[in-house]
């Protein structure tokens, strides 16, 4: 009886005649698809593509938080019920938040200065002819108030242009003091004449009354003379430059390369055989070389050694490739030594096997 009572308590009130649940249509009982009137507070659609960075949402849209069943008796957090305003704890305790207004920068506007305006002239005067606390060597070293107040109205590119020009003038003054002695000892005496004649294409700082430095003096470059006459011939090309040679005088010394005119000679100073050796050795100090037959007179021009006679740098012997039989059909292969002439048996019974059949996948499939 107790089990029936428990079953009745669970199921009969839901399914039986004691109690029936009323199902709600989709969208609620007040949905417009069933002909009901629209509610007094219609559902608002939020535009999620709009930015709300600079706008304080004081009276925001009331969200439609309709819960079904037992969930309609409570709400989570600060989400209000339907028809109520949102509760903002921060605005209730500290007031409305004030967001700083950040002005947008126009990145499409050009910052290249064209001409000298009044603001740029004031900045130039401040950077160059101002008091000592404003600028020193093209950098701000004084108080930030005096410099920033005058330079705030000038664009950043104009400011950098004036600073760079000031640094260049300071470097020119330093170079003038350090290089005064070098100007009197210049190797090219035509520098002053080129500047005075105007052939250099640069403005004359001396004629303009400005400072003169070594970096402001355009000098002509001396032309490199022609090569030595003996270098025109390939037989004498190694006389004036050892670095361009590639041969050696001895087999153990990488130094002292000799000239190209001695390659075909048979001097005793060379310990490497440069050509086919004779039958006997005239000089006992000379290292004996290997006799090369007439059929093997093919030399390596780099090492001077034969290709086939001495085995150094020789040709590899050709390996004979056995090309017998068809790897797909199996025709033409020779029988191996392990093959027996007996008739193979399967399961103890004598059966004739067709030896000419092709295995699955062919002989070259790797399974056989």
UniProtKB/Swiss-Prot annotation:
Q: Which residues carry this modification: Phosphothreonine?
A: 41, 102
Which portions of the sequence form the region Disordered? 81-106, 129-164, 196-256, 316-368
* Top-level taxon of the source organism: Eukaryota
Biased-composition ranges, Low complexity, are 129-157, 238-248
Q: Which GO terms describe its biological process?
A: positive regulation of microtubule polymerization
Feature: compositional bias, Polar residues = 337-354
One CC-aspect GO term: microtubule associated complex
Spell out the protein name for this chain.
Microtubule-associated protein Jupiter
What organism is the protein native to?
Drosophila willistoni
């Amino acid at each position: 009886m107790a089990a029936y009572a428990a079953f009745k308590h669970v199921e009969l009130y839901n399914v039986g005649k004691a109690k029936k649940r009323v199902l709600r249509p989709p969208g609620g009982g007040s949905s417009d698809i069933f002909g009901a009137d629209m509610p007094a507070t219609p559902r608002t659609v939020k535009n999620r593509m709009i930015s709300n960075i600079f706008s304080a949402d004081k009276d925001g849209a009331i969200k439609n938080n309709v819960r079904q069943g037992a969930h309609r008796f409570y709400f989570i957090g600060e989400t209000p019920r339907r028809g109520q305003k949102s509760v903002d704890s921060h605005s209730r305790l500290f007031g409305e938040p004030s967001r700083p207004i950040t002005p947008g920068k126009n990145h499409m506007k050009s910052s290249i200065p064209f001409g000298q305006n009044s603001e740029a002239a004031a900045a130039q005067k401040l950077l160059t002819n101002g008091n000592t606390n404003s600028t020193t060597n093209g950098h701000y070293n004084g108080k930030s108030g005096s410099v920033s107040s005058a330079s705030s109205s000038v664009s950043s590119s104009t400011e950098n242009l004036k600073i760079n020009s000031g640094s260049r003038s300071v470097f020119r003054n330093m170079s003038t003091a350090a290089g005064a002695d070098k100007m009197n000892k210049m190797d090219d005496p035509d520098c002053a004449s080129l500047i005075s004649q105007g052939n250099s294409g640069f403005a004359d700082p001396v004629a303009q009354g400005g400072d003169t430095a070594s970096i402001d003096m355009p000098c002509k470059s001396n032309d490199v003379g022609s090569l030595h006459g003996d270098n025109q011939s390939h037989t004498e090309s190694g006389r004036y430059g050892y670095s361009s040679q590639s041969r050696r005088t001895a087999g153990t010394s990488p130094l002292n390369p000799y000239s190209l005119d001695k390659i075909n000679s048979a001097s005793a100073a060379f310990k490497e055989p440069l050509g086919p050796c004779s039958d006997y050795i005239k000089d006992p100090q000379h290292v004996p070389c290997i006799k090369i037959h007439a059929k093997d007179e093919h030399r390596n021009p780099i090492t001077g050694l034969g290709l086939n006679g001495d085995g150094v740098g020789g040709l590899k012997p050709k390996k004979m490739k056995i090309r017998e039989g068809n790897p797909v059909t199996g025709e033409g292969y020779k029988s191996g030594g392990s093959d027996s002439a007996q008739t193979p048996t399967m399961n103890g019974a004598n059966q004739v096997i067709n030896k000419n059949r092709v295995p699955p996948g062919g002989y070259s499939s790797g399974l056989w």
